[in-house]
Structures are given as C-alpha cells and as structure tokens.
Amino acid sequence: MTEKQLSCCLDLMRRLPPSQIEDNLAGLLDLVPDLTEDLLSSIDQPLKVAYDAVSKKDYLLCDYNRDADSYRSPWSNKYDPPLSGACYPSSKLRDIEVQANEIFEIYLNLYFEGGVSSVYCWDLDDNFAAVVLMKKTQDQSKKGQPMRGTWDSIHVVEVKLGKKDKAVYKLTSTVMLSIETDNDNTGKVNLAGSLTRQDEKEYTFNEVDTHCVNIGKMVEDMESKLRQTLETIYFGKTKEVVNTLRNATGNSELEKRKNLSNQIGSAIGNRG
C-alpha cells in the first residue's frame, strides 16, 4: 500500500502547478506523514539561499548539505546553526569540493551573468558523489519591464571509481524554470515547469583536478541540452497553443464587423 500511495503522490505532483510545489508538498506531507522521507527525497523543490557570515557569501540549501536542522556552507565548511557530531566530507573529497565550487562560480558568471551556486560532496563505499546546485533569479520589473524569472538546476553525480584510472560518472539533472509577466495587454501570465534527464559517461581521472573537469564537462553539456529542449519543445509548443487559441483580431473589432454584416444584410433584404 505504501508503494502505491507514493506512486499516486508523485503522479499527483506531476500534474499540479510547479509554481505551487512547496504548498502542495506540505499538503501531501500532512495527508501521508509516513511518506515524509520518501516524498522529500523524490520531489525536487526550488532552491533556497542562505548567507554564510564566515565567508560572507551566499550558498544554496538542499538535503545533501543538511544534517538535522543545520546546513553546511561549501565555502567555510561550517554548519549553521553549529552542530556537534555533524557529517563532513573526507579531506580528499573536501579538496574536490573546494575546487568545484570555485569552478562553478566562474561558470555561473559566464553563462548566467551572476547568481548563486554550491557544490557538495559526500563519501560512498570506495566511491563518492556530488551535487551541483545553481540558481539564477532575474527581476526586470525594476527596469520597467513587468517580467520575473527563476532558473534552478540540480545536478547529482555518482562517481564509481574503476581500475586503470577509469571512472564512471552517472549524472541525474533536474531544471526548474519559472517565468511570470504582468501587463495591461496580456494580464498575468505564469509559465513554470521542470525537466529531468540522465546521462552516464566513462572518463579517465587523475585525482582532484580531473574529477572536477569531468563533472564540469558533463554538467555544461547537460545544461545546454536542457535549455535547448525547454526553448524548442516546451516554450515552442506553448507558443503554438497560444497562437491557435487567440484571435488575430480583437473581440471588439469582430463584434463591429458582425454588426456591420447584419446591417448590410438587412438593407439588402429591405431593397428586395
């Protein structure tokens, strides 16, 4: 019964507005509290931003940097609020984490012209995993354009170390995109959705540097594919549907033409 309930919950969440995912998820957790852990681990939520007072930098929150009610900053490697006996990556993995955070901060500035990024690593049995988080929020209303948008991307990479300096990188990527406009001509329009894709590749590696390069290459390629898919399929299809539904001529103009046609018909009938 539990598996069926979980399947129904996930199916329901896929059909509800992505912009209300947090409220809808909270409602589900109230209805089926026994599935709390499964639902929280299965449903991606918009990323939240926190501030690291030690490094004076923003970082992103997720389940992968949470221990109890505290979150670890990738910049200072400290938990907020402080937590005794908390989990930390091994020193070797921490080196990878530090370098990856520096790399993806540069990546975010180049591709998104700013935003917040965080990379977290954790140890597995003879292997390791990492998550790359990126968030970009744009508010054009401050510039006089009634448009706001948010891009959240979550890339989870599991690295299986093999023999002869070979490693298999399994990537699961999710992008959540939200765009909202509000003006007199169109009214309030909200487009939101999410997309998940997977990829797996084998690369050679050489300690810290190569792992960061390999993960960075996969994330960059995946984000490019996801952006293209969102633009050509999802937004392209939305535009096609809107163009099919809307009238090229306004309703008031159509009403005027209809009245004129009726008047002409009446006039012709009277002449006959």
Curated annotation (Swiss-Prot):
Presence of the UniProt keyword Cytoplasm in the record: yes
Family under the similarity heading: Belongs to the F-actin-capping protein beta subunit family.
Keyword annotations from UniProtKB, A to Z: Actin capping, Actin-binding, Cytoplasm, Cytoskeleton
Compartments, record wording: Cytoplasm, Cytoskeleton
GO CC term, one of those recorded: cortical actin cytoskeleton
PANTHER family: F-ACTIN-CAPPING PROTEIN SUBUNIT BETA, F-ACTIN-CAPPING PROTEIN SUBUNIT BETA ISOFORMS 1 AND 2
Cross-referenced Pfam families: F_actin_cap_B (PF01115)
Predominant cellular place of this UniProt entry's protein: cytoplasm
Gene Ontology molecular function, alphabetical: actin filament binding; lipid binding
Name this protein carries in UniProt: F-actin-capping protein subunit beta
A Gene Ontology biological process term: cell morphogenesis
Subunit structure: Component of the F-actin capping complex, composed of a heterodimer of an alpha and a beta subunit.
Purpose: F-actin-capping proteins bind in a Ca(2+)-independent manner to the fast growing ends of actin filaments (barbed end) thereby blocking the exchange of subunits at these ends. Unlike other capping proteins (such as gelsolin and severin), these proteins do not sever actin filaments.
InterPro entries found in the cross-reference section: CapZ_alpha/beta (IPR037282), CapZ_alpha/beta_2 (IPR042276), CAPZB (IPR001698), CAPZB_N (IPR043175), F-actin_capping_bsu_CS (IPR019771)
Keyword Cytoplasm assigned: yes
